[in-house]
């Protein structure tokens, strides 16, 4: 009995030890992958619940609004204009302080008050997205009585009092008072961001904790002890049962791609997740929409980052393919075919017309995001293809931080890129545009005091209208609402493609740094930091650290060179952070952004095609609530992260 018990205990311990080894191996094999669905689900549930339970919704409109017959919409406040001037009618004009050199637009006409105690009151809705500039004119004399600037809050209730100043009968005073405080519409965003950040940090810390040997040993001993006792006391622990976990069993581990840089996929996924979120509406917040003209918003960051990291991937993949001995002719054919597919898919996506009847060829939009990517990919990939040189072994062993081998080896490419940029500058600033000043970079419409209403985009807009025609361009540019532009303008137009090529080539440069100085962390980080500083200084000079007053303002619609240098500066800075954290130290696996980054084409095309379908969109109880839109957009974005994770686990990738 004693011998049988000892034999049974020894067999049980061996089985427990093998099981523990399998668990550890599985944990090492999965690594950061296993946290993917849990983190995505937590991000989804935590962000939605926190935004739902803690953030204020839309404030109910007060009785005063109903009596005045003013229905407030999102990003609006109620303004009651009190005219206390006897015998003087008023005209109130308005403009946004974000509208550069815009003409005032009429807001309301207020008749004169009939009695001293009963002023005439006119209710109007005013925008709360940016600060407002109000000008009160005497209707009869058409002279400015007063002018004031004010930042209204969403769903707030305000009064503008126009009365005689106490200092003199001929002087007019204008004051704004708050009747009812606005809601804090930015609170849902703050809560969702903090919850998401906290969950990412928590999961990363948990992974770091589980990677410690002491913690792993404690878990293994605990599991082994319980498993041993269970097997001893169980009648199923028979020695005659076939034991798959014998001493000769070696657990299978997943082979990871040692050559694949995880930070690149993480960066691509970060840009893609932000792109999905802002394309779905971004909670209808103005800073998640594209800027009206000059300046930057969150939505303006994502596309150029995607272009940048595409350039990085071009060099990494081309180097890998050619080093494996792939035929150059076959590689060139792949470049041409992929570019063609990107352009075709892009044209299909931007011209859905699913419910509007047959597609009219007269109004097909030709430019678009994937079209821009296709052309950019073709030019940059062909450029690298014809001038590609093998990376010498001595280069990867070189330790000097002052080496410029990654730049000097690419002088033909740099010469080509500088030539392209010279063409952009020449066309932008010297091409004569009928009816417009040469070198005009403005939005047209009511901008520039309304002098050039049909000059939107200057040379860029003119070239697109000349080559493609008005009907084949984007009909609702971001400048329409604020600047009241009247002509079609496409932000993915012909001239801007030159600078997207420049941006992709800067991404190629990042890829060369990663390859030329492989395993030399200090050399890589030094070069990332240097590029970040150089591009940042160029941006400072071009913009004069001003949204509108620089030599070349930052402008997403134009894809100005300052826009490219600024966003490339940001991109190098992000790689400066991601590379050591993700690939060198392994402190973060890139979850959850890594998974969409591995299936970027599928996620982008899928989110565009299925945008209006459940579960990505549903009817909201209150269409004028930022909170409800934010919840919907977070859910939709998180679902695409989950889809990308599932496809990653099933090894399903859409490659073109």
From Swiss-Prot:
EC number, as in UniProt: 2.3.1.78
Tissue expr: Expressed in the retina.
Keyword Acyltransferase: yes
Annotated disulfide bonds: 146-455
Region of interest (Disordered), ranges: 1-31, 234-253
Lumenal, vesicle topological segments: 1-185, 290-295, 360-367, 435-493, 544-557, 607-627
Main location group: membrane
UniProt-recorded Gene Ontology molecular function terms: acyltransferase activity; heparan-alpha-glucosaminide N-acetyltransferase activity
Active-site residues (renumbered): 290
Compartment(s): Lysosome membrane
Catalytic activities: alpha-D-glucosaminyl-[heparan sulfate](n) + acetyl-CoA = N-acetyl-alpha-D-glucosaminyl-[heparan sulfate](n) + CoA + H(+)
Modified residues (Phosphoserine): 238, 240
Record's keyword annotation contains Transmembrane: yes
Record note on quaternary structure: Homooligomer. Homooligomerization is necessary for enzyme activity.
Protein name (database record): Heparan-alpha-glucosaminide N-acetyltransferase
């Amino acid at each position: 009995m004693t011998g049988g018990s000892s034999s049974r205990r020894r067999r049980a311990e061996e089985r427990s030890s093998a099981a523990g080894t399998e668990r550890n191996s599985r944990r090492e094999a999965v690594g950061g992958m296993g946290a993917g669905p849990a983190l995505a689900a937590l991000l989804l549930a935590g962000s939605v619940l926190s935004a739902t339970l803690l953030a204020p919704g839309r404030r109910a409109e007060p009785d005063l609004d109903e009596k005045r017959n003013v229905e407030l919409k999102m990003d609006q406040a109620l303004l009651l204009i009190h005219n206390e001037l006897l015998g003087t009618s008023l005209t109130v004009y308005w403009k946004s302080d974000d509208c550069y050199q815009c003409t005032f637009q009429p807001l309301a006409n207020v008749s004169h008050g009939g009695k001293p105690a009963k002023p005439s009151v006119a209710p109007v809705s005013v925008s709360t997205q940016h600060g407002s500039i109000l000008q009160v004119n005497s209707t009869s004399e058409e002279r400015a009585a007063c002018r004031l600037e004010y930042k209204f809050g969403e769903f707030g209730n305000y009064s503008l009092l126009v009365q005689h100043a106490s200092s003199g009968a001929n002087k007019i005073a204008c004051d704004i008072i708050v009747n009812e405080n606005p809601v804090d519409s930015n609170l849902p965003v703050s809560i969702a961001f903090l919850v998401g950040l906290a969950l990412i940090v928590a999961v990363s810390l948990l992974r770091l904790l589980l990677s410690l040997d002491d913690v792993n040993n404690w878990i293994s001993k605990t599991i082994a002890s319980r498993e041993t006792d269970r097997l001893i006391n169980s009648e199923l622990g028979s020695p005659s049962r076939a034991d798959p976990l014998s001493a000769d069993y070696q657990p299978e581990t997943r082979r990871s791609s040692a050559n694949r840089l995880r930070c690149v996929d993480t960066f691509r996924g970060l840009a893609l997740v932000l792109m999905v979120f802002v394309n779905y509406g971004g909670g209808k917040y103005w800073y998640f929409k594209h800027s009206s003209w000059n300046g930057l918003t969150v939505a303006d960051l994502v596309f150029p980052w995607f272009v940048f990291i595409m350039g990085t991937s071009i060099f990494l993949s081309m180097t890998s393919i050619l080093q494996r001995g792939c035929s150059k002719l076959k590689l060139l054919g792949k470049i041409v075919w992929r570019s063609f597919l990107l352009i075709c898919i892009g044209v299909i996506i931007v011209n859905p017309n699913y419910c509007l009847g047959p597609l009219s060829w007269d109004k097909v939009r030709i430019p678009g995001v994937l079209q821009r990517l296709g052309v950019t990919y073709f030019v940059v990939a062909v450029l690298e293809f014809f001038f590609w040189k093998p990376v010498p072994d001595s280069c990867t062993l070189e330790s000097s931080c002052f080496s410029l081998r990654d730049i000097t080896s690419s002088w033909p490419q740099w010469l080509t890129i500088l030539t392209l940029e010279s063409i952009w500058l020449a066309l932008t600033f010297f091409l004569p545009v009928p009816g417009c000043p040469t070198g005009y970079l403005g939005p047209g419409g009511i901008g520039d005091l309304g002098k050039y209403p049909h000059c939107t985009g200057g040379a860029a807009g003119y070239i697109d209208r000349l080559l493609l025609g008005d009907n084949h361009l984007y009909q609702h540019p971001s400048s329409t609402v604020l600047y009241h532009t009247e002509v079609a303008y496409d932000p993915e137009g012909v001239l801007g493609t030159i600078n997207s090529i420049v941006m992709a080539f800067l991404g190629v440069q990042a890829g060369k740094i990663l390859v030329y100085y492989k395993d030399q962390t200090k050399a890589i980080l030094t070069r990332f930091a240097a590029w970040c500083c150089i591009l940042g200084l160029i941006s400072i000079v071009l913009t004069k650290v001003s949204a509108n007053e620089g030599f070349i303002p930052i402008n997403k619609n134009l894809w100005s060179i300052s826009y490219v240098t600024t966003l490339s500066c940001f991109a190098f800075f992000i790689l400066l952070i991601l590379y050591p954290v993700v690939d060198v130290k392994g402190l973060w696996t890139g979850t959850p952004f890594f998974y969409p980054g591995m299936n970027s084409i599928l996620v982008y095309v899928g989110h565009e095609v299925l945008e209006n379908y459940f579960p990505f969109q549903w009817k909201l109880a209150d269409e004028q609530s930022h909170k409800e839109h934010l919840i919907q957009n977070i859910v939709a974005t998180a679902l695409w992260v989950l889809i990308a994770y599932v496809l990653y686990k099933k090894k399903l990738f859409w490659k073109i």
